[in-house]
């Protein structure tokens, strides 16, 4: 499971900026002149757009394959984080939030399917727990480091650091994700 370990690293890297943005979203929105109502609208937009993607995941996965879905998710996490970094107004934040439908909403079902196809049946629960643990580790690290970095560096620099970390996560994802659909076809 060597590539699976790198997938966990990719997950931590991708979810670090995701968690920083979510945990400190009001600071991000205020930084570009928005307010709590704008933040609520942005969160609502992302949440509403996640639902159809998750509901249609199986259809997309059968057409594109799980590897492609994992890579699409990683790319859109990074695109979302980069757009958030460059956002100058709420419109750009809303554009970034739209990316959620191909980032988080794809990653959650894709990672479950991926683990179920990659690891042996007796390791499946451990595999799922490790992915969830990687997301949780990113959230804890983002909460601790994000607050300190925001105080020390400000919103813009923290978003830049997060976007760079996210791109590194996407690169790790490209290196680590195997074609598990091939495993399914061979069995």
Predicted segments with their positions:
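A late C-terminal transmembrane helix in Major Facilitator Superfamily
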Residues: 125-152
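Multi-pass alpha-helical transporter architecture, strongest
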Residues: 163-187
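Loop-to-transmembrane helix entry/capping segments in MFS-fold secondary transporters
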Residues: 36-37, 119-131
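Helix-to-loop junctions at the C-terminal end of transmembrane segments
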Residues: 53-65, 150-151
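Structural signature of the two symmetry-related core transmembrane helices
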Residues: 68-83
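A membrane-interface helix-boundary motif in multi-pass transporters
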Residues: 148-166
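Helix-loop boundary and gating motifs at the non-cytosolic
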Residues: 3-10, 14-42
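Intracellular juxtamembrane helix-capping segments at the cytosolic ends
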Residues: 106-119
């Amino acid at each position: 499971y060597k590539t699976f370990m790198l997938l966990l690293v990719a997950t931590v890297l991708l979810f670090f900026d995701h968690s920083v943005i979510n945990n400190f979203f009001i600071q991000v929105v205020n930084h570009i002149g928005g307010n709590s109502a704008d933040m609520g609208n942005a969160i609502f937009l992302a949440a509403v757009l996640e639902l159809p993607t998750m509901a249609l995941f199986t259809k997309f996965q059968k057409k594109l394959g799980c590897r492609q879905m994992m890579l699409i998710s990683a790319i859109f996490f990074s695109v979302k984080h980069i757009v958030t970094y460059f956002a100058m107004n709420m419109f750009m934040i809303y554009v970034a939030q739209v990316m959620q439908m191909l980032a988080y909403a794809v990653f959650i079902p894709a990672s479950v399917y991926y683990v179920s196809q990659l690891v042996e049946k007796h390791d499946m629960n451990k595999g799922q727990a490790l992915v969830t643990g990687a997301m949780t580790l990113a959230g804890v690290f983002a909460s601790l480091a994000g607050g300190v970095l925001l105080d020390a560096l400000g919103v813009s620099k923290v978003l830049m650091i997060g976007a760079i970390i996210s791109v590194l996560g996407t690169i790790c994802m490209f290196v680590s994700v195997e074609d598990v659909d091939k495993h399914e076809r061979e069995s």
